[in-house]
Amino acid sequence: MNQTNFGFKKVDYTKKQGLVNNVFSNVADKYDLMNDLMSLGLHRLWKDEFIRQIPNLNSHILDVASGSGDIALKLAKKARDRVNNISLTLSDINEEMLKQAKKKAIDLNLFQNLKFTVASAEELPFPDDSFDYYTIAFGIRNVPDINKALKEACRVLKPMGKFICLEFSKVKEGYIKDFYKFYSFNIIPSIGQMIAGNKEAYEYLVESIDLFPSQDEFRIMIKDAGFEEVGYKNLSGGIVAIHSAYTQ
């Protein structure tokens, strides 16, 4: 029986996606508020830097693990302000999270040029060579088979298409590392209990972050999936990193 990690627990590979779905379904309505509280607002700055990696908004963009739509809606607003002809597809395996994204898109009057697709990052329902950009923010670590998801990203991107991933990473500096670990394992689950009523969901969150490969390990995984010009940029001392690569 193939096993994988669900946080620090070992589970059957076939069960992980359902467990992850339950986590996000249970916190969907508090997801954005929790992001602000957990990161002390820093996630907004990280995401702003992330979308700067997309210079050409006259593009077909696939946002995978789109969640509540933060990345896609930032791009849609930026494109609208610049009168760009953007095409954005928001994909997530969790329908409850996509419902949150749709609500936000309607509230912000950004529904035009957006498509919503319930799909797994491991099996995307799109033809080869479909998109100019593939974005995924804080989602790849939740995928049961990360290598398979990376190969799918490579498949759906056009030649010279750009893969961009924002993910929690490994802090280098000792004093930041110690504080970050204490904050992650002791404070974040407590905030999750107080605000979302779900301590276990946020225990999974910090455990999944702790187990995610280092910047250099993930860079190798991206390269092995078929990408070229693979690199990364650390933000906030390595709390998160932006990974980027191109198809051939």
Curated annotation (Swiss-Prot):
It is an enzyme of class 2 (transferase). Pfam families: Ubie_methyltran (PF01209). Pathway: Quinol/quinone metabolism; menaquinone biosynthesis; menaquinol from 1,4-dihydroxy-2-naphthoate: step 2/2; Cofactor biosynthesis; ubiquinone biosynthesis. NCBIfam families: MenG_MenH_UbiE, PRK00216.1-3, PRK00216.1-5. Keywords: Menaquinone biosynthesis, Methyltransferase, S-adenosyl-L-methionine, Transferase, Ubiquinone biosynthesis. It comes from Rickettsia africae (strain ESF-5). The gene is ubiE. S-adenosyl-L-methionine binds at residues 68, 92. One of its GO terms (molecular function) is demethylmenaquinone methyltransferase activity. HAMAP family: MenG_UbiE_methyltr. This is Ubiquinone/menaquinone biosynthesis C-methyltransferase UbiE. GO terms for biological process: aerobic respiration; menaquinone biosynthetic process; methylation. Belongs to the class I-like SAM-binding methyltransferase superfamily. MenG/UbiE family.
